[in-house]
């Protein structure tokens, strides 16, 4: 369960004939408007993120600091029919609001997560669109980028320990893959993209599901010719994960 946060402000707005709302961190942002969630509003200060995702993320240069704007998009076959609309179940159940609040809860627990700045949704009858704005982590590379080069052995151990920390807090990450694990120049690991994530009672089934998804991601990135290397590297990660889990850290 995500606790109430007194620093959150929910501001309703109208966009044309549509109604929506913006949930934001009043300590980081003094004013908000719908344009913050539209790449064209930023003009030359918005740059598309080239790696991962579905062409739905931009780096933006803002007065409150560099940030990442991500619009929620569907994947798979359903995206051919409905790219970016979701069934309306109430504002508090929109994907952007849920992710914003989950990230703030994870930060309150001391976990390495970028700071969410604002979340937005616009209603379209029984459907809605959504977007989220968060702090940009500077000087980081994704695990996907690292494995295409020469990733250091210590990275695998650090990543394994980081995942164990999140799992011990009950985070079931819906899309744990190599694009969503970041490392900075000091070796610090970060986890991103908490869409559809949830806090649960720690259990073997969903923890193993997360780890299996990460392994599939690594195999996909490095290809069939690197299968043995992928399994060797992942075994290092897994040993560090298991050791951290057994020690309760």
From Swiss-Prot:
Broad class of the protein's primary localization: membrane
Organism: Xylella fastidiosa (strain 9a5c)
A GO MF label: protein kinase activity
Keywords: ATP-binding, Cell inner membrane, Cell membrane, Kinase, Lipopolysaccharide biosynthesis, Membrane, Nucleotide-binding, Transferase
GO cellular component: cytosol; plasma membrane; preribosome, small subunit precursor
EC number, UniProt record: 2.7.1.166
Catalytic residue positions: 175
Pfam families in UniProt: Kdo
Name of the protein this chain belongs to: 3-deoxy-D-manno-octulosonic acid kinase
Name of the coding gene: kdkA
HAMAP family: KDO_kinase
Pathway(s) it belongs to: Bacterial outer membrane biogenesis; LPS core biosynthesis
InterPro entries: KDO_kinase, Kinase-like_dom_sf
SUPFAM superfamilies named in the record: Protein kinase-like (PK-like)
Family classification: Belongs to the protein kinase superfamily. KdkA/RfaP family.
GO biological process: lipopolysaccharide core region biosynthetic process; maturation of SSU-rRNA
Subcellular location: Cell inner membrane
Gene3D superfamilies xref list: Transferase(Phosphotransferase) domain 1
Membrane-topology descriptor: Peripheral membrane protein
Reactions catalysed, as given in the entry: an alpha-Kdo-(2->6)-lipid IVA + ATP = a 4-O-phospho-alpha-Kdo-(2->6)-lipid IVA + ADP + H(+)
Domain of life from the UniProt record: Bacteria
Any coiled-coil regions, as ranges: none
Function as written in the Swiss-Prot or TrEMBL entry: Catalyzes the ATP-dependent phosphorylation of the 3-deoxy-D-manno-octulosonic acid (Kdo) residue in Kdo-lipid IV(A) at the 4-OH position.
